[in-house]
Amino acid sequence: MTSRLSTVLLVCWWTLAACQDATPVQGPTETISTGRVLGKRLDVLGKSVDAFLGIPYGEAPIGELRFRSPVARQPWEGTYNATTHGYGCYQVPDESFPGFEGSEMWNPNVRLSEDCLNLNVWAPHPRPSNAAVLVWVYGGSYISGVDSLDVYDGKTLAAEEGVIVVSMNYRMGALGFLAMGDESAPGNQGLRDQALAFQWVQDNVAVFGGDPSQVTLFGESAGAASIALHMISPESMGLFKRAALESAGLSVPWGYYTVEEGTRRGMLLAAALNCDTDTGGSALSPSQVVDCLRRRDVVEILADQWVTTDYLDFPFVPALDGTFLTERPESAQQRGAVKDCELLIGSNTNEGTFFLIYEVPGFSKDSDSLLDRDGFGTALKYAFPRANSFGLSALDYQYTPWLRPNDPALLRDAVDQATGDYNFACPTYEMALSYARTGQSVYYYRFTDRASNNPWPAWMGVLHADEIAYLFGLPLHPEKGFNSQEAALSRRMMRYWANFARTGNPNGASGSDWPLYTVETQEFLTLNKSLVDGQITIGRGPFAQACAFWREYYPTLLTQTGDISEAERVWKQQFSDWSTKYMVNWKAEFDSYVNGKQCE
């Protein structure tokens, strides 16, 4: 008897769905469209919250469903045990800094499986009536992420603000974004997973006290980029009312590819797994390639899916498939062909540093990453691999700290600024401006607060994703190591986001801290601990100059210098060197002379 019980428990541990009836019904239960679910009641800072974790919203995308669009979950018999998180979707954990909290906090904390289409709901107890709903979409470069991370725990936001919080897992990497141009692997599987979860919210959130007509999507990085794509997709525009985007927008340069490029990358993956040709050496069709990939072990796919080599060029991303995405995101943005909704959007001070330490020469977590002029040029060349010599010279000129052009710390910070502007900050700025032009209500923020317990070195500043902990209320829990001011800032930010979800205005009914962002004023709110002391800092035109460079000058320069003759290229390069590098050297000599030193 003991042996048999042990076997049952072991099987349950490995596959929760197979044992959904094994747990006695103790705790809060609700009946949703697919059956009955059992949750657990939590005490959160003296308030009660019911958590329903790991609820399946899609069938397991395995076998013939691998690489296909998701299929809604069929009803089950009995009561589903939703007291623990479900499986996370397959990914490769970050092992760059073993044991280091700053990177380990983003690694999966649950078992991984292809059977990962599940979601979580946190609802206040007693149940509210027609409460606003906040649906979280995690980031992770479209290759990693899981909804069970401590930093994504929705219990505190639900408890403090009386809102319903939902989060979901979705497929990533090749499993989520392989695009081969036909129905066998149409592309955008991960985005369609998200949309299926949004539909689940529409169908079921009222059971938990939520209002399906008051759904706000919020997400960070690739999660925010995903939401931006839902804002232009004909397949998902009707599934939510508002959007809050952190550190990404429609024009992120890493956010999509054409089906042709997706197919090219898919064939590289196929070649690595011997799925590109038949036994006679003849090339396989895309559907035959996909059939072969379906028979490969998922671990093999994960091991070989990184088919790109450029910096911040993620291997499998959303595709312009003609159905979910019918035009280039930046074109839709320029035309104003976007969802009619209120928008909250912004970015952090140092968006680039987190990525620089992984790939760019001269940058390290374990040093101050100081750069000389040569190191500055090398870093720019690596961070912008598609720039020709004229583009690199323009970057050098635009981001050189001209007041002290040889200062190693300023040169380091300038590479962070260039990387952050291009990949994250300017896409948020451009989307805010575009939305404001359509007459929509837009609220822009700049998060500038470095937490007292931040494990990353001080030079890295306020990193990409640092704001997330504040939005989920982690600083309110003493064991997390934040101070009292950070806890107060977290309360303020949760209130802003919840007010936005309730009314479309982060200020709520009577506040006026956060000004409306308009084309004329371009005002934004600075989010840091000074807010706690009543010091409200309003900025204007956060990146107008820098983003004009990326929007207007830089792409035009690359286009116009892409096919010039060698003689003209050399002459222009020499002129560019004179206007940047040699001017820096001249200024250094002049400064030495002014300071009473002998020029050499």
Question: Model-derived features: where do they sit?
Answer:
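Surface-exposed patches in mature extracellular/periplasmic domains of secreted proteins
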Residues: 213-215, 274-292, 304, 407, ...
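Non-catalytic accessory segments of hydrolases
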Residues: 13-191, 212, 312, 475, ...
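Short, solvent-exposed turn/loop segments enriched in Gly/Ser/Thr/Pro and often Arg
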Residues: 171-174, 218-222, 445-454, 512-520, ...
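Substrate-gating cap/lid region and adjacent catalytic-acid/histidine neighborhood
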Residues: 251, 292-487, 496, 503, ...
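Bulky hydrophobic/aromatic "packing anchor" residues in well-ordered structure
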Residues: 57, 71, 76, 293, ...
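A structural signal for well-ordered alpha-helical segments within the folded catalytic domains
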Residues: 50, 114-117, 192-195, 199, ...
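C-terminal, loop-rich substrate-recognition/catalytic regions characterized by aromatic stacking residues
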Residues: 338-390, 534-598
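Serine-hydrolase-like catalytic core of hydrolytic proteins
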Residues: 4-6, 12, 100-287, 323-326, ...
